[in-house]
Amino acid sequence: MDKSQGVLLSSNVGAGSRPWPELLGSAHWDGLLDPLDLTLRRLILLCGDLCQVTYDSFNSDSHSKYCGTCRFSRSTLLDRTQFPAAGDLSVAAYLYATSDATAFPGSMVYSMSREAWSKESNWIGYVAVSNDAAAAASGQRVIYVAWRGTIRSLEWVDVLKPDLVDHDDILPEGHPGRGRSRVMKGWYLIYSSTDERSPFSKYSARDQMLAAVRELVARYRNESLGVVCTGHSLGASLATLCAFDIVVNGVSKVGDGAHIPVTAVVFGSPQIGNPEFKKQFEEQPNLRALHVRNMPDLIPLYPSGLLGYANVGKTLQVDSKKSPYVKRDTSPGDYHNLQGILHTVAGWNGKDGEFKLQVKRSVALVNKSSGFLKDSNLVPESWWVERNKGMVLGQNGEWQLEGPAEENLPVPPVVTGKIIDDDVAAVATSSSAKEDKKTGKGSKLLSGLIDQLLCVPDTCKAGAA
């Protein structure tokens, strides 16, 4: 990855550049999308790379006892995944989710081992914050919430029921959306479900996220603050819900003062809720959403207005077919692949402009979890893999799956009391890291179309959904 992108949080933001409020959508990105502003382009890519971290670090091997976990500790996550701005951010909290397997097929993966770390929970994302050096250079302390998308192929779309449910449980008393605003059941269950059987899901992913963000807002209340929620595919839906939740429940309010800006920057997002949810979202004065959509990608059309859904926020539409580096005849999953979208953003010069990379970004990243690049680029398909798929030769001469080092073992989240320990707080303030329901009516209206258009090979890897 392009390590120079790390300067986004320092020299590229501030004097002579777009101020943070504009980047976070204070003016709804008017004049910044066409042509695409360079600093906004870098911010979008940074958010996309934060999403990619969730794919690159997730253990999806069902043979492993630790399937469903993050492979790395909070203190090493960004470095081990070669995140380009690792020196500017510190990971403050991990998020874990649970859900009924029938609510969202493919969203959770579990170990086949009897000694599995958990049979109920999956790692679903993380909360990070800019450190002192980056905050001082940019004049803005930014809290990032990154949500993981699905690991399975796009076949989930064919079996997922697009039922709409109310989300009154997360709306404050007296909120005008109570009983009217509805979101897809699958997204909502992953976001809000708990399972007492698992120490990782005694609190919902929502509760874990709110506790972490609330703590960071309180810690940095005297600084210029912003919150960015980001995700791809399923993660985009969770990020949109998350941003809305932070605002309507007052987590973005600093004491008795004004609300800080909260922005969802999402990629390849399915539709989240009904027109009332859209209305309630867009009426919040400090809440924005920017959806980066690849035009040939079909997922953002799902479930569709025919089933009672509406798009939320502003859309930056790009078209990967303009890139000379990628295949023209490819599977639908490639158009939805996160790295394919980020590659297109890096070279996007408008629908009438010629594709030309505007920032230094390796073309090889496109094939990180796909075969989207033309063979003439000489980049192997799906090249981001664990060495020997995690197999090691033991002293007894037997090959076996290697477990994580002690510092990388999953640790249950703490939500009550002080949720960010002193070591992690020190990391956040240092430029060098230390150790850290009501169901609506579903519909099969789209099933025939989906059968035809989303027939994705089983070889679809992480980042394709």
Curated annotation (Swiss-Prot):
Q: Which GO cellular component terms, listed alphabetically, does the Swiss-Prot or TrEMBL entry include?
A: cytoplasm
Catalytic EC class:
hydrolase
Presence of keyword Ribosomal protein: no
Any one GO molecular function term: phospholipase A1 activity
Entry keywords, A to Z: Cytoplasm, Hydrolase, Lipid degradation, Lipid metabolism
Q: Where is the active site?
A: S233, D297, H336
Q: Which Gene3D superfamilies did the record assign?
A: alpha/beta hydrolase (3.40.50.1820)
Query: Among its keywords, does the record have Lyase?
Result: no
From the Swiss-Prot or TrEMBL record, state where the protein is found. Answer: Cytoplasm
What main location does UniProt list?
cytoplasm
A Gene Ontology annotation in the biological process aspect, one of them, is: cellular response to UV-B
Assigned EC number: 3.1.1.-
The record's listing under CDD domains reads: Lipase_3
What is the purpose of this protein? Acylhydrolase that catalyzes the hydrolysis of phospholipids at the sn-1 position.
Q: Tell me the protein family, please.
A: Belongs to the AB hydrolase superfamily. Lipase family.
Q: What is this protein called?
A: Phospholipase A1-II 5
Per the UniProt record, the source organism is Oryza sativa subsp. japonica
